[in-house]
Curated annotation (Swiss-Prot):
Organism: Pteropus pumilus (Little golden-mantled flying fox)
Keyword line: Electron transport, Heme, Iron, Membrane, Metal-binding, Mitochondrion, Mitochondrion inner membrane, Respiratory chain, Transmembrane, Transmembrane helix, Transport, Ubiquinone
Described purpose of this protein according to its UniProt entry: Component of the ubiquinol-cytochrome c reductase complex (complex III or cytochrome b-c1 complex) that is part of the mitochondrial respiratory chain. The b-c1 complex mediates electron transfer from ubiquinol to cytochrome c. Contributes to the generation of a proton gradient across the mitochondrial membrane that is then used for ATP synthesis.
PROSITE patterns: CYTB_CTER (PS51003), CYTB_NTER (PS51002)
Note, other: Heme 1 (or BL or b562) is low-potential and absorbs at about 562 nm, and heme 2 (or BH or b566) is high-potential and absorbs at about 566 nm.
Residue positions binding heme b b562: 83, 182
Protein name: Cytochrome b
InterPro entries (UniProt xref): Cyt_b/b6_C (IPR005798), Cyt_b/b6_C_sf (IPR036150), Cyt_b/b6_N (IPR005797), Cytb/b6-like_sf (IPR027387), Cytochrome_b (IPR030689), Cytochrome_b_C_euk/bac (IPR048260), Cytochrome_b_N_euk/bac (IPR048259), Di-haem_cyt_TM (IPR016174)
A GO cellular-component term linked to this record: mitochondrial inner membrane
Membrane topology, as annotated: Multi-pass membrane protein
């Protein structure tokens, strides 16, 4: 009798994806973040579902409903903080996952990489809309400022903004539709994740050396299931430490008062994971230019396969490229810091220099470094 795991149509898919999947024997813990992102998504969907049962998407009661969840609903406080800090864990894993892809040349698998970039945009859109829902001052003014950026689009901009707002300002209509989209997008993300995995399993995983590993593969289970479980345990532990000891560490205290359209906070800033993009946006004095730079700061990832000039796939044996990569990481950390600072000297000029360096590194310095390394190979 054939093994049901290998013959049943449904179990066969699971078996080929998670159990008998051939995986390179040399992949390090940097390859854990895909499964961690899957766990983050599951946590977000589950906690979000239970929060949605008690949340009301009306401007008069939204803030009160969040307070009610934290005070009156059984374990509502832990649901709310798991969801808020789960988003932070999601982005930490996302940034590390993308960074791993850049370092080890995973972008050579174009389809997987491009679906990944679309996923990044979708997660960022979801997180932005979720931040609007508690209806505190940062929620309200963040929604106003970011949606208002679309008015920079020539000809259709103003109409587009009013269409998104559902009126002439951020109001009831905006909150209701943001809640609807915030609920819908995670399921679209789940579908995209399956497409991402579909393309990945067409080629198989990359490995730290960047050399094809077809001759040295091991089954995913038990080796990498155990490894992923260890990573999951570490991440869940970190998340619970954050939620139970300092749940407001990454949030903004300004958001603990109800939104007031008549009173603008002194410093409008997004959650920490958007600060690097916000700094790039602010560093350009022109509205349309800022919006373009903001979009391109993420969209530039799609160009990575075209900008790959090296004869080697991974950066493992390319010390000069490693220097450029870590310079890029340092630059992104600088941008994150600048995004949270007020718009005044010296932060303005630091932000502008860091923004220029960001684009310069990806578009010019890293490809040139790779070409130099190709010539050094001949010595």
């Amino acid at each position: 009798m054939p093994n049901i795991r290998k013959s049943h149509p449904l179990f066969k898919i699971i078996n080929d994806s998670l159990i008998d999947l051939p995986a390179p024997s040399s992949i390090s813990s940097w390859w854990n973040f895909g499964s961690l992102l899957g766990i983050c998504l599951a946590i977000q969907i589950l906690t979000g579902l239970f929060l949605a049962m008690h949340y009301t998407s009306d401007t008069t009661t939204a803030f009160q409903s969040v307070t009610h969840i934290c005070r009156d609903v059984n374990y509502g406080w832990i649901l709310r903080y798991l969801h808020a800090n789960g988003a932070s864990m999601f982005f930490i894993c996302l940034f590390l996952h993308v960074g791993r892809g850049l370092y080890y040349g995973s972008y050579v698998y174009k389809e997987t990489w491009n679906v990944g970039v679309i996923l990044l945009f979708a997660v960022m859109a979801t997180a932005f809309m979720g931040y609007v829902l508690p209806w505190g001052p940062m929620s309200f003014w963040g929604a106003t400022v970011i949606t208002n950026l679309l008015s920079a689009i020539p000809y259709i901009g103003t109409n587009l903004v009013e269409w998104i707002w559902g009126g002439f300002s951020v109001d009831k209509g905006t909150l209701t539709r943001f809640f609807a989209f915030h609920f819908l997008l995670p399921f679209i993300i789940s579908a995209l994740v399956l497409v991402h995995l579909l393309f990945l399993h067409e080629t198989g995983s990359n490995n730290p050396t960047g050399i094809p590993s077809d001759s040295d593969m091991i089954p995913f289970h038990p080796y990498y299931t155990i490894k992923d479980m260890l990573g999951a345990l570490a991440m869940v532990l970190a998340l619970l430490m954050l939620v139970l000891f300092s749940p407001d560490l990454l949030g903004d205290p300004d958001n603990y008062i109800p939104a007031n359209p008549l009173n603008t906070p002194p410093h409008i800033k997004p959650e920490w994971y958007f600060l690097f993009a916000y700094a790039i946006l602010r560093s350009i004095p022109n509205k349309l230019g800022g919006v373009l730079a903001l979009v391109l700061s993420i969209l530039i990832l799609i160009l990575m396969p075209l900008l790959h000039t090296s004869k080697q796939r991974s950066m493992m044996f390319r010390p000069l490229s490693q220097c450029m990569f870590w310079l890029l990481v340092a630059d992104l950390l600088t941008l994150t810091w600048i995004g949270g600072q007020p718009v005044e000297h010296p932060f303005i000029i630091i932000g502008q220099l860091a923004s220029i360096l960001y684009f310069l590194l990806i578009l010019v310095l890293m490809p040139i470094t790779s070409i130099v390394e190709n010539h050094l190979l001949k010595w």
